[in-house]
């Protein structure tokens, strides 16, 4: 949604078995297309940015197929141990395929920042690139999903703007900006080579 707000043509391809992104997109107006993987070939033709929402899986063929042609794969990772372990497993597979990837810490409870710091240290200790910021755990994200809007537009039960929504929006803006910087650096490096 950050890139759509910046004027890019964005398409989210829902490759997750539970079709959560498609359901989210059907609830409201997100400002970008959300399509099931079966419709991706046609729907992504005019997109400048294609985001694939896939299921967390360490199945090699599935990861290879979903990440083929990607400029970068972002691995959303909660600070919980199993999520960190799964990200490390997926990273090893992606590294074996030579696919650029980075972890993004999500659902970070600011009251328990120590767990996020430990997760970051563990991921970096295994050689993973971890995006600088993290996405906070906020009720505004749940409200936005129910309403079918971006977190920036989330409102409470009385129709008032959720007071913490901009904290979530700012976190996604920072992650999007860092991803753009990474891709620009990669592009410049490829041109120089």
Predicted regions located by residue number:
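P-loop/Walker-type NTP enzyme "switch/lid" segment
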Residues: 1-68, 145-156
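Hydrophobic anchor at the start of a short beta-strand
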Residues: 9-10, 50, 73, 100-102, ...
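Conserved Switch II/interswitch segment of TRAFAC-class P-loop GTPases
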Residues: 69-88, 109-112
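G-domain G4 guanine-recognition motif of GTPases
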Residues: 78, 101-117, 133-145
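Conserved C-terminal guanine-recognition region of P-loop GTPase G domains, centered on the G4
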Residues: 84-110
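Beta-strand-loop-alpha "switch" segments that mediate conformational coupling across diverse proteins
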Residues: 119-155
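Inter-lobe coupling/hinge region of RecA-like P-loop helicase motors
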Residues: 143-173
């Amino acid at each position: 949604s950050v890139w759509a707000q910046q004027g890019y043509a964005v398409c989210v391809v829902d490759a997750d078995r539970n079709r959560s992104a498609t359901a989210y997109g059907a609830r409201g107006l997100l400002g970008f297309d959300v399509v099931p993987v079966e419709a991706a070939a046609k729907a992504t033709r005019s997109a400048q940015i294609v985001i694939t929402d896939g299921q967390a899986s360490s199945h090699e063929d599935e990861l290879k197929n979903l990440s083929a042609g990607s400029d970068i794969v972002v691995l959303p990772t909660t600070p919980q141990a199993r999520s960190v372990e799964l990200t490390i497993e997926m990273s090893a597979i992606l590294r074996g395929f030579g696919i650029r990837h980075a972890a993004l810490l999500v659902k970070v409870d600011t009251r328990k920042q120590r767990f996020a710091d430990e997760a970051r240290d563990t991921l970096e200790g295994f050689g993973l690139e971890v995006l600088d910021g993290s996405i906070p755990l906020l009720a505004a994200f749940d409200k936005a999903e129910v309403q079918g809007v971006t977190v920036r537009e989330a409102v409470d039960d009385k129709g008032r703007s959720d007071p913490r929504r901009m904290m979530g929006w700012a976190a996604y803006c920072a992650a999007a900006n860092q991803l753009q910087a990474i891709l620009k650096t990669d592009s410049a490096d490829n041109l120089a080579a």
